[in-house]
């Protein structure tokens, strides 16, 4: 399995050959396009028409997010794979390759039209309009000029961006007009290098309209002054749901071909996500929908409501669910196990297959529900269709027990493949519990430690760890403990992080202690060395700083990825109470001041550790006090950096007093930080970051009204402590003011006794008013105190009286009972005598 892989030299040679074949194919396409132009009678050369599959694009749908992903994102381009996949397309599925349908050429724009639309695109990009009214009128004119030229604009290299911006700014009526213009030509558009982006944008922006129409919340469109109302076509009168279904009808015959088409596969993925009602702008979804080098076209003034709906899970009609099921069945109907295996290793087909499998498994009914008799009869009459999961792993979970079964061979062939392993990750994450148990019991469970060592197989193995029970997880930890040091040396830090996270989630405390012990052993048996080991904070050379990030060598990128994963482990351990957090806090306090400065300012990942440490409960006495004190010498340098700035701002928001479980920074330490900031006030005011820190710490209040700053800074304390301190502080302040006033009056009387008696100046009106108010307030307070005292005394008297009455009643009752008992005793005695 892993030993039969090609060497690095062979892979590079294959890649060069594939690129050469790609260039040759591109040149042939250019020649064919030129011949086509000559036959159409159009002899002038124009850069607007670019042949399909031209240029050197990237591999869509993949993101290098880990250390081992460099090998996983290897480019498997070549005619052999394409031919093998397209050879299984069938007659009606468009599987015969690009020639299975006739590509349309929509013509080219005239030079004047090109110039006009390019200028319009520049204006919209710059948003350089004096007012909104002028922008609205300008847009109306652009729409008017583009009427009837939508297909030419979409397939033009220089004007397709304008079409995308127009779609972003379109209202519901205009979007339906776009669907009407593209109708009947969608298959040619989605397989075109530039027009495919316009189709994707149209699908994405029209998705919220379906939800709005279902809820009856379609906003009314304000007509533009001077614009003539046009007659609506049949397509424009339809609902957005029907327009999407009509588009699917055009795709139906070519689904197998679109699975692996360089541009069409992206449009198919977008359409599937729209039909499923899933969020369309999440990080994971973006990597699935577009390649790394794809330009993201935006424009100011696009509808904010639509973007909110795109970011949420949307309500979709039942017809969309049925359409997804039909797409899954039709696209894979003519693909057998061998073809699916080839498609799973194809760089363009794999992401589409991932999405189809994900949708199928998420839409599958969960739990056993009793069906009615009529439904059971209908199901028996209908032929049972084989699902995509059954095609990939036939006979699962029972077939996993046999090493020679197709299901077992499929998993073993995918687990070490840089592209196929991604499909295996999707299968492991979403497959039913029975299938997962069989997969773990027969394939991953016995060899989990060897899978976790490998840079490619570790990713499916991590997905397995995420689904394990507490007992199975403990077994996996026991198998991996002897090789824990090797995992750290090989850079499998994501495996280490997953182990700690899952043990914490499953409450496996014994395994957590074992993992921490193994980590400590790998770091010279000392907690102080853990953070430096996981996050090597080496100083950069001046030459390295001068180089641009785009041209970083592979080794530098690898170090950055390792640092990122190391920071994630430290953050994870800080969030686990007990010994893990205690070990990290011990290691952080052992760092010198310059290392803490570098950690706080290097990048977002290292700064995240400092932020996490300041927000987690202390496991060591006075941890936050000592940690902030270590930052104090370099607090200005931290304040003036992008990543350190939020850390300095967060210190003032921390409590000055509190319980043991609350992060506390003593007030005197905050005063020391503020004093440091005041010394470099002029330097802080020179930059935006410095001004932000000065505002957050209320530096002007510190300079002008220190008492108010102290009161404000202590507002971060817990409410009970703050109220108690405020009450005590107010009394102390009143006493101090009274003592000062008496002392001043006594000194004045001693110095000028006659003047004080004879020539005492009259008080001004405001002073008199204040004095009267104060006297009234004091009288009122005295009166209230007196009333409270009287009420209290009355209440006490009443309670005493009630107690006395109760006591008397009790005594009377007891006497009465004694009297009643005496005659009874005498009667009993007489009866006994008789």
Curated annotation (Swiss-Prot):
Keyword Repeat: yes
Compositional bias (Basic residues): 1-10, 770-822
Any one GO molecular-function label of the UniProt entry: RNA binding
Region (Disordered): 1-54, 749-834
Localization terms from the record: Nucleus, Nucleolus
Pfam families linked: PUF_NOP9
Compositional bias annotation for Acidic residues: 749-764
Family statement: Belongs to the NOP9 family.
Name of this chain's protein: Nucleolar protein 9
Organism of this sequence: Podospora anserina (strain S / ATCC MYA-4624 / DSM 980 / FGSC 10383)
Taxonomic placement: Eukaryota, Fungi, Dikarya, Ascomycota, Pezizomycotina
